Amino acid sequence: MKLDRVIIIVLDSVGVGALPDAAQYGDEGSNTLAHIAATVDLRLPNLTRLGVGNITPLRGIPPVGTPAAAWGKMASQTAGKDTTSGHWELAGLILERPFPLYPHGFPPEIIEPFEKAIGRRVLGNKPASGTVIIEELGAEHMRTGNPIVYTSADSVFQIAAHEEVIPVEELYRYCKIARRLLTGEHAVGRVIARPFVGEPGHFIRTDRRQDFSLEPPRPTLLDAVIAAGLEVMAVGKIKDIFAGRGISRWIHTHDNMDGVDQTRNFMREGERGLIFTNLVDFDMRYGHRNDVAGYAAALEAFDRRLPELLDALETSDALILTADHGCDPTTPSTDHSREYVPLLIYGKRIRPLNIGVRPTFADLGATVADLLGVPYDLPGKSFASMLLE
């Protein structure tokens, strides 16, 4: 007998140790969760009970003799360490080539057609921290009306604009234009709208960010679940990451706690299928800013909410906690890190056992399909037979 429902929660960037090829990405020695625990007095009693301390050594978070969940970790086989490819691999789509990166900004063959299409010049066109570049160029943007374009170590084309200078809907239109232009060798993973408000010296990015992702080039777990007549409910930026494909219902969120609330709301409805949630604050607000204390506080805040999710599980449910990459806030880099991701699987019918090290995130997609009884022929090897009582 299979399960009725699986809830996947991606703790965005909560990596658990450098992958063997991490040095190729400049990430040798990274371990997001362990280094946070080594730096601050991290207390995660509920995750500890599930077995997070059994996955990787954590100061102050010991392994437990009998974890409440199945535990393990997964390696990535995708080329890259970004949000989109990480989530796609979780859903059974492994990319052989990484998305293009622009460490020196975007070339004229990208910028010139974009400027012509929107009827404005762009400011910036370089890699930058989003909060830094709006402080640097925000006043000029307000004076000229020209949007700020920037990138990062991720495959992203980001457009920042003050909401009173370029209305948000117009900013979204610019992003759709960029998305249409960024194809072929320049097919970046995401075009991102980054609206902000305020005055020079006091700019604040708003929660009206929107991602315009590439559509997955091949089917994913989400398509398989929909094809089987089940629901796929997306919380947070999941809908954007998959460009809306394979999703029956979705809701954006303001922050991690809203993400937990919206996940609970979908759970209350009792629909059969998949709830797929991304909690982005760990990465966006703390990892990229090297804010160790903030990252730790966000982990503890999620840990306090975890019992609500566990208590809401029905007999034929499973809750899966994992991540998409690392973003070690204790290293000089402010970029993602190439890491293993944790795997905790809890449910009334789930055996609490050591899953070990899975060779690809795609094993999770195959396992979820198996747990739901969904026909599936994508990459990855199911370990569902280990899990079910």
UniProtKB/Swiss-Prot annotation:
InterPro entries: Alkaline_phosphatase_core_sf, DeoB, Metalloenzyme, Phosphopentomutase_DeoB_cap_sf. Transmembrane segments: none annotated. Mn(2+) 2 binds at residues 283, 288, 336. Mn(2+) 1 binds at residues 12, 324-325. Its EC number is 5.4.2.7. One of its GO terms (molecular function) is phosphopentomutase activity. Isomerase that catalyzes the conversion of deoxy-ribose 1-phosphate (dRib-1-P) and ribose 1-phosphate (Rib-1-P) to deoxy-ribose 5-phosphate (dRib-5-P) and ribose 5-phosphate (Rib-5-P), respectively. This is Phosphopentomutase. The gene is deoB.
